[in-house]
């Protein structure tokens, strides 16, 4: 089992929703410091103030950062590393679900392009074979990555499927043996968050689809999602995938993901 005690963490999209809940759970578990990266300065300063009051001023730091601007993202990494000497954990949580014609490219930029840049920077700084001391990267995918969704949030689903594939690939045992950096994917079910509240689509029926989906899968709280993420951190192997839905404990679904890849690749090398 892996411990969070005395670890230094970065959480992107940490100003509200699931990200803020993760920050709180990490602090309750005894992390040394959490850097909150978010573009929302008002919410970021607010959560920083709340957490500092409860856990101490040195335990948390808000850094205004648009993760799609690589210079800002890398500067946040360097600032955290220079202040604490190292980074142990990165949670790539920043994301949106907006598929309106003028927004779908930003959904891709935030959900996958920026997440990839953050993942690679974390890997560069942590990897043991390049002078680091190992660590853990947790990438937030979604239950949408496991489904063929109706054409309402299919771009969002595609970005989350890409996140899942990236994380599973980087987490392969043969690669982890060299880097000592775990990569873990978390697939959340419907969760009350800004993404949930601000769902956007080119399809005008999005609200009707949302209502149907909620009946099938009642939304869980961000706090439940964060508890599931901590469980995955403590017990997950590199390359593992965890499902957190319906307000139930986190489930390791790695064997199912691996089986799916086996089926899909059956005839490739014949």
Features from the language model and the residues they span:
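Hydrophobic positions on the long internal alpha-helix
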Residues: 76, 91, 118-122, 126, ...
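Rossmann-fold cofactor-recognition segment
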Residues: 51-69
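Substrate-binding pocket helix/loop in short-chain dehydrogenase/reductase
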Residues: 100-108
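Conserved NAD(P)H cofactor-binding loop of Rossmann-fold oxidoreductase domains
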Residues: 93-98
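C-terminal helical subdomain
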Residues: 185, 204-259
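Catalytic loop of short-chain dehydrogenase/reductase
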Residues: 99-100, 132, 136-177, 188-191, ...
């Amino acid at each position: 089992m892996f411990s969070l005690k005395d670890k230094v963490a970065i959480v992107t999209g940490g100003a509200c929703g699931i990200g803020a809940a993760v920050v709180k759970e990490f602090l309750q578990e005894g992390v040394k410091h959490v850097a909150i990266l978010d573009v929302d300065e008002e919410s970021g300063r607010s959560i920083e103030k709340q957490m500092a009051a409860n856990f101490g001023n040195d335990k948390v730091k808000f850094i205004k950062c648009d993760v799609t601007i690589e210079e800002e993202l890398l500067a946040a990494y360097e600032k955290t590393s220079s202040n604490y000497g190292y980074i142990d954990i990165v949670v790539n949580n920043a994301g949106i679900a907006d598929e309106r014609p003028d927004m779908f490219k930003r959904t891709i930029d935030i959900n996958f392009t920026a997440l990839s840049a953050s993942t690679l920077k974390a890997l560069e700084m942590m990897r043991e074979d390049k002078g680091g001391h190992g660590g853990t990267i947790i990438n937030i995918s979604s239950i949408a990555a496991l489904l063929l969704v109706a054409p309402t949030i299919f771009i969002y689903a595609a970005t989350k499927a890409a996140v899942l594939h990236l994380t599973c690939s980087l987490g392969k045992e043969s690669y982890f043996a060299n880097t000592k950096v775990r990569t873990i994917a978390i697939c959340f079910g419907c969760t009350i968050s800004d993404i949930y509240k601000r769902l956007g689509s080119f399809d005008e029926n999005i609200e009707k689809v949302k209502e149907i989906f909620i009946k099938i899968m009642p939304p869980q709280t961000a706090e439940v999602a964060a508890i599931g993420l901590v469980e995955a951190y403590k017990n997950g192997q590199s390359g593992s995938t965890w499902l957190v839905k319906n307000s139930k404990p986190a489930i390791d679904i790695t064997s199912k993901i691996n089986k799916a890849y086996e089926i899909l690749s059956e005839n490739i090398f014949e």
